[in-house]
Amino acid sequence: MQVSDFTFDLPEHLIAQYPAAERTASRLMHLDSETGTVNHYHFADLPSLVNRGDLMVFNNTRVIPARFHGKKASGGKLEVLLERVLDDYQALVQIRSSKSPKPGSTILLGSPNGLGQNETAVHVEGRAGAFFKLRFPSPGVLKIAEQLGEIPLPPYIARDAAVSQSSEDAARYQTVYAKHEGAVAAPTAGLHFDDKLLATLAEQD
């Protein structure tokens, strides 16, 4: 098997910009490993495709609001994406900006509409490879993320950057079994499970 076996063209107009009304209404492609036959189902059909004793492994990390909008002291806009929380007050991040902020400078994180509401000053301590190391003030990285951050949707999901994130996006980009905070991206295969489907699968065990 070669990695190239999985290469395919995906037209942009076929990429769903919003989820199905019901999580389990998403489409499911099934490949029979013995015959090579491909069949198409809906995710709600999953229980009919698994057997007693099959092992299913779930990633129960919870996506944090890891994307911030902000600006440099000069006024230039930037976007910050948390990559790794080092401790309560320090984090490694990606910064998207026309010009990178300098080590020792301060950036302001705030609302995406640029109105300057609830802005928080964050210190740029320096570079760490491809990332920047930031120091956050009290109450710390995760608390500030909850106050000012957004759930980082994938780049192929188009949203107006000037509009605050909807509560629907924030809820649907979490699995129903998410518990442990820390992920900056959802384990997307798990987004199609709902509580009813999980209960049905548990009964088959």
Task: Annotate each PLM feature.
Residues 25-26, 205:
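Class I SAM-dependent methyltransferase SAM-binding "motif I" and its flanking Rossmann-like core
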